[in-house]
Amino acid sequence: MARVLVLGCTGMLGAMVAEVFLREPGLDVVLACRQPDNWKSACPRRVTVETFDAEADADGSGLDALLARGCPDFIINCIGIIKPYCKDGDRAGRRRAVQVNALFPYRLQAAAERRGARVVQIATDCVYDGVAGGYTEKSPHNALDVYGKTKSLGEVAAPNCLNVRCSIIGPEKHNRVSLLEWFLGRPDGSEVSGYAHHRWNGVTTLQFARLCGDLVRGGRGLDFDGLAGRGLVLHYVPNETVTKYELCGLFAKVYGKRVTVRKVMDEGPPIDRSLGVLDPVLAPDGPSTAMEAALRQLREFTLVSGFYG
């Protein structure tokens, strides 16, 4: 039975990875986050939730102790300082982003290597400036903001570390600052702007969590060790490209929200951070999944699993 440690289990990504893994037979799951009391789940399976703060653990001693207690075979790193919390003019936010996004992945990789563990690390489309679109694994990183630069620096090249690049949307248990939660929080009868000049081909947190499950179990013929040796980062692009206007319209349709999405094309420059793929091993069928279908699967899982606890 593989033992898996999910770091950052109360964030948008970590919460979904935890919920999916706790329902997977044959996995021994340990969770970790800054405030374990915030973890809640409708899953009847008992789980250990450890306390861990990547920002405060500058010397790595807390991480070493956590791995010694948990003895994981795989670590899914869902810890990160996201864009809203590391604005360029925010000195404290910049410092946190450097510690957590850029430096922590190296401490994690080294600590995991000492114990024979493998690490799955999410990489972001925000390492690109969004001018050209269709960015492949070989496209140079050219973002100039704190988030993009720190996430770029945190992509670790090592045999026990697999960087998976994608952009994610999903529900949140706590902070509710994501695009989906923001939209769902709009009152019926309201109007929101939908940017038709912003293009995106990300994934749901459920899709990413299930990919992680395949990487741990070797599902769909995915061999972690072989994949980690294929390059610094692999792009995961199973879904079609949509505009943010179309995406918000799908939110309304799938979640039954009576919210009007106003089409906007003239506010700010066009943004296209869509990803291209040179090595389609993670999604060999290419971008064949309709975004509506991916969102319906996400909504169904959220309801059936009792995601919000």
Predicted ranges, named:
Residues 209-272, 305-309:
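Mid/C-terminal beta-alpha module of Rossmann-like enzyme folds, strongest
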